[in-house]
Design a protein with these regions (language model features):
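C-terminal functional modules
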Residues: 416-495
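Bacterial N-terminal signal peptides
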Residues: 7-16
């Protein structure tokens, strides 16, 4: 049968039209899909895995077997491996050369998943599982990789921190949607900010350990952030206290670290001192441990509207900070969508690709609102200009997942990103048993209202024409009927 390369638009139109292209169930949208004319078969009831001996203990293998019924004989065979493994060596040339990329082949006889690395293999497994989620599989091959290297969430909002259980649930969600970073930086954790020198008490430390372990099981790097700028002294004593705190976190299983200098004044804002401290941490802690991820820092001047060009804060960081250290950036203002011109502007000053801290769907500046809006407004041609992209969510962890679903899709495959279709898919996945009620409720809970940042979202689009007719003073009977029906639906959705 003739193979055809499915465009992403076709794949998503299959989903929205109710057709059974199973790959359309996958989020993020894959980069390339070759389908055998839409040939479908029943998803297997049992599977068995084939791999190199040591691969069976990998996160990918465990995820596969934990989500499927495993049987040694007569089951659907899923062959898994990473480039270089003997079991999948003949497929190595088909695997994209991008970090975290993977190749997936699905046929009636079995499936093959080969990752460029461990994360790539894990993401291939997630694609297979998502494809099976409605009881069918499609004969196809998937060649896939992420656009942005680091993708995920920074818990950096003011207000009530997420509960321990909410964070665990978030990591499961990130893993399914191929996000690889979570940065722990709740402003109300005293051991992160106000008492940053003080070690975590045993009970709180064990909770951090559990978070780090659970994140790892979902392919997520758990970044623990420290915020010393409020009262740091820039002396050896404070420098050693900071490194000692990081060592404590390392012993708890944390393997990724960030240092924040945001929202501070006075002595802690000096760029040369920040660079000196961070280079010391990088040289004497991060680089000494081969299993630790690159250091991330949040600068004091973290958006364009706050930059003082005469003082040269950003240029000092750019020239003095080790090039392996990532620098966060919120855009042209504190709450702003990310555009190409703005990323070019900051990248030239910091002498590296910006690590975006996007303040959406956070609502700590309008705490009487929630936003269930889709993720949109960021340019679609900036993937090669970013080192990372993390979203700052609401204090409402579950409600944040609609936007985070979009962040995962956007950062994985920007050029194919369609925020309207993505939003519909998010609603369907997050509340499949009552998706229509969630959709109705979300339609009228998107906008943030008037706020000091001037950041607004479209809301109630489906009512605009009806409202205009009513406001004309002479609404038709049909308008009144439709408006009454929609208001009744809204009332039911709120129950």
């Amino acid at each position: 049968m003739k193979k055809t390369l499915l465009t992403v638009g076709f794949v998503l139109s299959c989903f929205s039209a109710g057709m059974q292209a199973q790959i359309a169930l996958v989020n993020p949208v894959p980069q390339q899909v070759k389908a055998e004319g839409g040939m479908l078969f029943d998803a297997p009831k049992t599977i068995k895995t084939f791999s190199d001996k040591g691969r069976s203990n990998s996160t990918a293998a465990k995820t596969l077997t934990e989500n499927c019924n495993v049987q040694a004989k007569g089951a659907y065979c899923v062959t898994i491996g990473v480039v270089g493994d003997k079991a999948t060596k003949k497929y190595d040339k088909l695997v994209p050369k991008h970090a975290e990329g993977y190749y997936l082949s699905i046929s009636k006889k079995g499936a093959v998943i080969v990752g460029r690395d461990e994360n790539g293999l894990y993401y291939g497994v997630q694609t297979l599982l998502a494809s099976m989620s409605e009881g069918k599989l499609e004969v196809c091959t998937v060649t896939d990789w992420p656009d942005v290297p680091f993708r995920g969430v920074v818990e950096g909002f003011y207000g009530t921190p997420w509960s321990h259980e909410a964070r665990l649930s978030q990591f499961d969600f990130y893993g399914r949607h191929k996000m690889n970073v979570y940065i722990y930086g709740p402003k109300d954790d005293p051991y992160h900010r106000g008492h940053w020198r003080v070690p975590y008490p045993e009970k709180e430390g064990l909770r951090i350990k559990e978070l780090a372990e659970h994140a790892k099981r979902n392919g997520v790097s758990f970044y623990w952030a420290i915020h010393p700028g409020v009262d740091i002294k820039w002396n050896n004593e404070d420098r050693d206290a900071l490194v000692a705190k990081l060592e404590q976190m390392y012993k708890l299983g944390v393997r990724a670290f960030a240092v924040f200098f945001d929202d501070i004044w006075g002595e802690g804002t000096k760029a040369d001192k920040q660079a000196e401290l961070l280079n010391y941490v990088d040289d004497n802690f991060i680089q000494k441990k081969p299993d630790v991820a690159p250091l991330v820092m949040c600068p004091t001047e973290y958006n364009r509207s706050w930059v003082n060009e005469k003082k040269g804060y950003l240029r000092t960081l750019g020239s003095k900070l080790n090039k392996s250290i990532n620098i966060m950036w919120t855009g042209n203002t504190v709450v702003h969508c990310i555009d190409k011109e703005g990323t070019d502007w900051v990248n030239e000053r910091i002498e590296r690709k910006a690590y975006i801290w996007w303040n959406f769907p956070v609502t700590d500046f309008v705490r009487d609102h929630i936003t269930l809006a889709p993720t949109y407004g960021n340019d679609l041609d900036i993937a090669d200009k970013l080192s990372g992209f993390v979203s700052n969510p609401m204090e409402h962890a579950e409600a944040s997942k609609i936007a985070l679903y979009g962040v995962a899709d956007y950062t994985w495959n920007m050029k194919a990103y369609d925020f309207k279709k993505d939003w519909e898919k998010a609603i369907h996945e997050l509340l499949p048993g009552n998706a229509q009620a969630l959709r109705t409720f979300a339609l009228y809970n998107k906008d943030l209202g008037k706020n000091g940042h001037g950041f607004r979202r479209e809301e109630g689009e489906e009512l605009k024409e009806l409202a205009a007719d009513v406001n004309s003073g002479k609404p038709s009977a049909e308008t009144i009927r439709q408006l009454s029906e929609k208001l009744e639906q809204l009332g039911v959705s709120c129950d």
